[in-house]
Amino acid sequence: MREQGREGSSFLSQQLGPTIEDVMDLINSDRDVISSPSVFVCEDAPSSILSTVTVAHYVPHEQCPSTSWAPQREGPNPELNITEQPKQRGMRFRYQCEGRSTGSILGEKSTEHNKTLPEIEIINCDGLEEIHVIVCLVWRDPPHRVHPHGLVGKDCHNGICEVTLNPQNGVAKHSFSNLGIQCVRKREIDSAVNERLKLNIDPYKAGKWRLHEEVDLNVVRLCFQASCTGPGFKYDIPPVLSDPIYDKKSTNTSELKISRMNKEYGRCEGGEEVYILCDKVQKEDILVIFGEDKWEARADFSQADVHRQIAIVLKTPPYHDLHITEPACVRVFLQRITDGIRSEGMPFVYMPRVKDPNGVHSKRKHRDCSQLGDIGDPDPHGIEMKRRKVRPSYADHLIPPYPDINLPLMDSFNHNEGYHDLPLMNPDEDAFHFLTEDPHFSDLLTHDPYFLDGYSNQFLPDQVNGVTAHLVGSSLALTDEEQPLPDCAFNDSGCRR
């Protein structure tokens, strides 16, 4: 039956062509055909079995026509170069609701007094009529997918920038002015990317991101594409990427800057406390470096010493040479741990070591010199001088505060009766009779004149002169009779009571 079936199948194969069984028999007998070609005899030629397979003719790679040029252009191909990169840090990405108050992307050579812009140059443009340039934003890292943030400003629409250049003398240059970066919210990321892809804005044909990938919203790159057209041909220049541009408001990518330091010098042994005011930093991602050309050291501080991301309290590291004899100037930097970015350096001076920081030796030397100078003094320790000091008495306030001013002589007061006479004591007899009848005034009028001789001169300082004593005595006297004062009361040589 099997043979009859095979005969029947052979008959059908002649009528309908090769069957699946014939193909399997051909595959299984391939080894036998190689070892002994005469073993297998096919009723039909292999060409009849594979007659339905079409094989294209091989064309060498050198003979393939170019898809960029039609026809081929003589000379080197055009090239796009970035003559000035955009400034990487210092620009803040703005939302659409914030407007365009932040300015534009500056060039890397820009300074406070001289503003520059990103610039491109296209060379080998001989014979080209115009060049169409498209600028878009892509990821920082490969595969450089389209970024959801967009460009805004002059010649910008739908998040991209388009300009048309006319080359002159085989070269085309262009500076991008008033070009800003507009960021999107997280809920708008998907729609922004889909809009770019619909416009066929995908320089590296990377498509949309995968589910496990995450978009970095704090950093972008500018991607420049150029399409050159001429008489009867067109050429697309490969895309060129700029340096990364970081968002200023993000502490993970922002520019590092030291605003102020409370000390600009310190001991070479280190360990001194220094306060640094800076822009916002991440306390777990920041270092403070003291260094010069061939030496660097880290300052000592912890995360708790970073106050509100804008102040750092640290201790200075020791200088590598503790035996310096002259001040050594170094620089102080802020350094981010993740990307190694550093701030501009601030000067700091290490001072030589002080041999006697507490001044013990200088004090001892001064004391020794003073003792040597007092060897010939009869009272080297000042004991007798202390004994001669007099206690302050009640008359100390009589000493004039300004010794250069001399008091007037008492003779001038003797001729002016108003200075030592009572207002009611006048030659009027009625007034005198009135005073004598009063017991209080009668005792005063009959009392003996007051003299300073009744007071011991030990209560008077040596500085009180005769004029002052005469003035006091005249003030105490209540009579109009002038009482002379003895000279011996103020003479240290003789009279003592």
Curated annotation (Swiss-Prot):
The keyword rRNA processing does not apply. A motif (Nuclear localization signal) lies at residues 386-391. Keywords: Activator, Biological rhythms, Nucleus, Transcription, Transcription regulation. Residues 359-383 are annotated as: Disordered. The keyword Cell inner membrane does not apply. GO terms for cellular component: cytoplasm; nucleus. Residues 78-393 form the RHD domain. GO terms for molecular function: DNA-binding transcription factor activity, RNA polymerase II-specific; RNA polymerase II cis-regulatory region sequence-specific DNA binding. It is found in: Nucleus. GO terms for biological process: canonical NF-kappaB signal transduction; cellular response to stress; inflammatory response; innate immune response; non-canonical NF-kappaB signal transduction; positive regulation of transcription by RNA polymerase II; response to cytokine; rhythmic process. SMART domains: IPT. Does not bind DNA by itself; probably associates with a p50-NF-kappa-B homolog to act as an activator. Could be involved in hematopoiesis and spleen development. May play a role in the regulation of the circadian clock. This is Transcription factor RelB homolog. It comes from Xenopus laevis (African clawed frog). The gene is relb.
